[in-house]
Amino acid sequence: PSTMSLLGLVRHMAHVERSWFRRVMAGQDAPYLYRTPEDRDADFNGAVADPAVVEQAWRAWRDEVAFAEQYVDRTPDLSTTGTTRDGSEVQLRDVLVHMIEEYARHCGHADLLRECIDGRVGQ
C-alpha cells in the first residue's frame, strides 16, 4: 500500500525545495528534513495526523520556498550552476523548470487524493 498523503506531499516538497536550492544551487550542507539512511521515504512515512507534525511540515515548506525565492532574486543569471550529488553541474534555469515539473506532478497527486477523500474534482 502507498503511504502517499496530502501531508506527505507537503513534506516531500519541502525536501525537494531544500535539496535543489540549498544543497545543489547554494552549495550548503543542509541536513535532510526527513530522509534518513534507513528510510528514504520518511517524508511520506512520517506524515501523521498530529497537529505538531502538520504545523512543522507547513513551516518547513514555507521556509524552504522563502529561501528559494531569495536565492533566485539574488541570482539574476539563470546560467548560474550548482553541483548535484553525483558531481554533475546543473543550471538554475534547469532547476526552475524541474521545480515546475515537480509541482505540476504533485499538485495532480493532491487533486486525486482530494477527490478520493470528498469527491470534489479540481477546477
Stretches with model-predicted labels:
Residues 41-83, 93-99:
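Acidic/histidine-rich alpha-helical segments that form the ligand environment
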Residues 1-41, 83-123:
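Short, contiguous alpha-helical
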